[in-house]
Amino acid sequence: QETCGTMVRALMPCLPFVQGKEKEPSKGCCSGAKRLDGETKTGPQRVHACECIQTAMKTYSDIDGKLVSEVPKHCGIVDSKLPPIDVNMDCKTVGVVPRQPQLPVSLRHGPVTGPSDPAHKARLERPQIRVPPPAPEKA
C-alpha cells in the first residue's frame, strides 16, 4: 500500500487544475491520477487514498472540490474506483462497493404479460392441454 506522501506527490501536478488556475489537468496530473486509480482496487485501499486526498485538500485550502471530482473525467479514467472526494465526507463509505441490484425474476426471463395484453388473452382463450374426446361406447 502506498504512503500518503507518495499518493499526494503523484497528484501534485493536479494542483493548478484543482485550484482553478488551469482549464485542463496536465499530462503529469493524469498520469498520477491513473496510477492512483489503478492502485485503489480494494476497499481498504480506497479508504486510505480518500483519507490522503482529504488531508491534502485541507492543507491547500484553495482546492475546489468540484474540480477534484472532474479529474477522472478529464483524464479519461472510466469507472474510477474512487468516488468524488469531499473534505467533509466519511472516507469509510468509499470502502464499500455497492452491489448491482438484481433484476426481478420476471424481468430476467422476458416481459410478463398481463390481462390487457393480447398475448395474455390469446393464451387464456386456447387450452393449454388438449384432452381427446371420450371414445364412443359400444352397445
UniProtKB/Swiss-Prot annotation:
Q: Specify whether Transport is a keyword of the entry.
A: yes
Region called Disordered, residue ranges: 102-139
- Output the PROSITE patterns linked to this UniProt entry: PLANT_LTP
Q: Does the keyword Amino-acid biosynthesis apply?
A: no
Gene Ontology terms for molecular function: lipid binding
Signal peptide coordinates: none
Disulfide cysteine pairs (residue numbers): 14-29, 30-75, 50-91
**Cross-referenced Gene3D superfamilies:** Plant lipid-transfer and hydrophobic proteins
Where does the record place Pro residues bias? 130-139
User: What does the entry give for GO biological process?
Assistant: lipid transport
Report which superkingdom the organism of origin falls in.
Eukaryota
- Recite the UniProt keywords alphabetically: Allergen, Disulfide bond, Lipid-binding, Transport
Q: Where is the composition biased (Basic and acidic residues)?
A: 118-128
Assigned protein family: Belongs to the plant LTP family.
**PANTHER family assigned:** NON-SPECIFIC LIPID-TRANSFER PROTEIN 2-RELATED
Q: What does this protein do?
A: Plant non-specific lipid-transfer proteins transfer phospholipids as well as galactolipids across membranes. May play a role in wax or cutin deposition in the cell walls of expanding epidermal cells and certain secretory tissues.
Would you tell me the protein name for this molecule?
Probable non-specific lipid-transfer protein
Originating organism: Parietaria judaica
